[in-house]
């Protein structure tokens, strides 16, 4: 049975170790009108490769403002590491639901980088 590929993906790399960030908890939310409140769509964890497949199905995606919340404090504490950022929030806008969106996160205890990937 074929599975639908998610139009939204993320990949988290632990740049301190040079390895994928396995087991990092993340939450996906969408900003809902008219109250402008975040509605949580999914909570998940990165897999062995630092990826989180199936964040959204093609039927779930719609134009709007989305947020990926990464629980970096818990991730680093589980590794016995102090960190500066307790969490990372990446807020982005989807204008065309027919496109694919990839949100990589490069993570260390003292910094992070994100960008729109392909």
Swiss-Prot record:
A GO term from the CC aspect: peroxisome
One term of GO molecular function: hydroxyisourate hydrolase activity
InterPro entries assigned to the protein according to its UniProt record, in alphabetical order: Hydroxyisourate_hydrolase, Transthyretin/HIU_hydrolase, Transthyretin/HIU_hydrolase_d, Transthyretin/HIU_hydrolase_sf, Transthyretin_CS
Subcellular location: Peroxisome
SUPFAM superfamilies: Transthyretin (synonym: prealbumin)
SS bond list: none
Gene Ontology biological process terms, A to Z: adenosine catabolic process; allantoin metabolic process; amide catabolic process; AMP catabolic process; dAMP catabolic process; deoxyadenosine catabolic process; deoxyguanosine catabolic process; deoxyinosine catabolic process
Enzyme class: hydrolase
Keyword terms: Hydrolase, Peroxisome, Purine metabolism
Gene3D superfamilies listed in its UniProt record: Transthyretin/hydroxyisourate hydrolase domain
Any Pfam family: Transthyretin
EC number in record: 3.5.2.17
Residues noted as binding substrate in the record, renumbered to the chain: 11, 51, 115
Membrane-crossing residue ranges in chain numbering: none
Subunit-structure text: Homotetramer.
Function: Catalyzes the hydrolysis of 5-hydroxyisourate (HIU) to 2-oxo-4-hydroxy-4-carboxy-5-ureidoimidazoline (OHCU).
Extra facts: HIU hydrolysis also occurs spontaneously, but more slowly.
Protein name (record): 5-hydroxyisourate hydrolase
Organism of this sequence: Mus musculus (Mouse)
């Amino acid at each position: 049975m074929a599975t639908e590929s998610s139009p939204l993906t993320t990949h988290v790399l632990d740049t301190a170790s040079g390895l994928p960030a396995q087991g990092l908890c993340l939450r996906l939310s969408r900003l809902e009108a008219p109250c402008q409140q975040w509605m949580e769509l999914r909570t998940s964890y990165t897999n062995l490769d630092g990826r989180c497949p199936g964040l959204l199905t093609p039927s779930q995606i719609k134009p709007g403002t989305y947020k990926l919340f990464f629980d970096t404090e818990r991730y680093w504490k589980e590794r016995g590491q102090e960190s500066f950022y307790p969490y990372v929030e990446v807020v982005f806008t989807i204008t065309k639901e027919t496109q694919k969106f990839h949100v990589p996160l490069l993570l260390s205890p003292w910094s992070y980088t994100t960008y729109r990937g392909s």
